[in-house]
């Protein structure tokens, strides 16, 4: 997520027009901001690293937990319900990558998904007014 019309902005737009939003509670991932990926790319370039690297924020959450935190940080009171439908919409139930190569090369890992989202929302809410 980052600038543009992605999951955060789409969810907030839905919160403006829908009284209740259903979000999968059985699909797990590690939401990662574009800013955190950019920081890792910079560190890889500094180290002149090569190879295949995964770069994801720390921690795991469901899409429901991610959406709940977005709405809370945005001050939205929209009701949000868990929908259990892993696999029905083409999304795997567990989609968490491992930062193994970053750890092996001693490259600083991205922050937790909560910290990254908090920072993103703080800046985005200022920008959005």
Show where each model-derived region lies.
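NAD(P)-dependent short-chain dehydrogenase/reductase
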Residues: 1-29, 35-36
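A hydrophobic C-terminal alpha-helical subdomain
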Residues: 87-105
